[in-house]
Design a protein with these regions (language model features):
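Ser/Thr-rich, Proline-interspersed low-complexity disordered segments
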Residues: 1-50
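N-terminal "mature-domain start" segment
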Residues: 44-175, 270-281
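Short, low-complexity, polar/charged sequence segments that are solvent-exposed and flexible
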Residues: 136, 202, 231-235
Length: 281
C-alpha cells in the first residue's frame, strides 16, 4: 500500500499558484475566525483555538497512546516492508506506519502520521539515520546544542531542505524522549505557508530499540495559506524574501516562537499530550 508521508512530497511552493485558499474547518474546535485573516491585521490581532480533545486510546502491536478524537479518526497501523534502495529515504528496515484517518483540516499537502523504526537495524543499514539519531541523543542530553543548530534531526530523509525550525522543546514520552519542533521543507527559496508547515516529534525509546517520527500539519493565522496568497497579499514579506531569505526565515521562526500554543490549530499542547502518552514496546 502506498503511504503518504513527507518522504513522497516533492511539490514546491513555486508551483502552487493555482491552489485554492483552503482554510481549516473548525469541526469540534472553535476558532475566533473561520476565514483567512487580512494579512495586515494578522500580526496585531492574535487568533486562538480551543479544543475538547475527546481522548481515545490506541493500542496495537506494542504501540499505545491516547489521541485526541476531536482531531483524528481511528488510526490505522500498517506494516511496511524494508527497502535496500537509497532513494526516498532508504535504505530502511521494515517499520510500523500509523496513518491518522479522518483528519479534519484540509489546508496542508501532507497527512499526519507516525513511523516507528527498529532503531538498531536502521542505524546499521543507513549512515544518515545513524548520524541523525546520534545528533538527537546529543541534543536531548544537552539542549544548549539546539540553540545554534542549522538543522534538527528528522527521519526519514527526503529530497528537500529543512529551511527553518522553531518552537523546539524536549518532550518525554512513557519510555523515551525526543525533540518536538515546527518546520518546513523546500527545494527552493519558497515562502513559509500553512500548506507546508508541520509539527514533528523525533524520539528514541530509553532502551534505544525504537525510533519514532511523528509528523502533523499545523496552521497559524500569521502565515499565508499558500503561495498564491503570499504573492498577492504579503508584499513586504515577498520583498524581504527576495532580498534576504535567511532574514525572512528568521523573522518567521521568531513569530512562531513567540506565539502561544493555542495560536496554532491544532493547539500544540494537545499534540504534546498525545506524545507524552506514547509507549513503544
Amino acid at each position: 500500500e502506498e503511504i503518504e508521508t513527507p518522504v513522497s512530497a516533492e511539490t514546491t511552493a513555486g508551483n502552487q499558484a493555482e491552489e485554492e485558499n483552503n482554510i481549516p474547518e473548525q469541526s469540534s474546535q472553535t476558532g475566533e475566525n473561520e476565514t483567512n485573516p487580512d494579512p495586515t491585521e494578522a500580526a496585531a490581532e492574535k487568533k486562538t483555538f480551543t479544543v475538547e480533545p475527546n481522548p481515545q486510546n490506541f493500542n496495537q502491536t506494542g504501540i499505545s497512546f491516547v489521541f485526541p478524537g476531536a482531531i483524528f479518526g481511528p488510526p490505522e497501523l500498517i506494516q511496511v516492508e524494508g527497502s535496500d534502495e537509497t532513494e526516498m529515504g532508504g535504505p530502511f528496515p521494515g517499520f510500523k506506519y500509523i496513518k491518522f484517518d479522518s483528519y479534519f483540516q484540509n489546508f496542508s499537502i501532507f497527512s499526519p502520521d507516525m513511523l516507528v523504526f527498529p532503531a538498531f537495524d536502521y542505524r546499521k543499514m543507513n549512515e544518515y539515520a545513524n548520524e541523525s539519531i546520534e545528533l538527537l541523543l546529543t541534543m536531548v542530553a544537552d539542549p544548549q546544542k539546539i540553540t545554534n543548530a542549522e538543522e534538527l534531526p528528522f527521519l526519514p530523509s527526503f529530497n528537500a531542505a529543512q529551511v527553518f525550525h522553531s518552537n523546539v522543546e524536549v518532550v518525554e514520552f512513557k519510555n523515551g524522549k525526543g525533540l518536538r519542533y515546527l518546520t518546513a521543507y523546500y527545494q527552493d527559496y519558497s515562502p513559509v505557508t500553512n500548506e507546508y508547515l508541520w509539527y514533528t516529534f523525533q524520539g528514541l525509546t530509553t532502551d534505544g530499540r525504537y525510533y519514532v517520527s511523528i509528523t502533523i500539519p499545523v496552521y497559524h493565522f500569521g502565515l499565508p495559506a499558500n503561495y498564491e496568497i503570499f504573492k498577492n497579499s504579503y508584499k513586504e514579506d515577498a520583498k524581504e524574501l527576495q532580498n534576504d531569505y535567511q532574514g525572512y526565515l528568521a523573522k518567521i521562526a521568531s513569530m512562531l516562537d513567540q506565539s502561544a500554543q493555542n495560536e496554532f490549530n491544532p493547539p500544540l499542547i494537545v499534540l504534546d499530550e498525545m506524545i507524552k502518552s506514547l509507549q513503544i514496546r
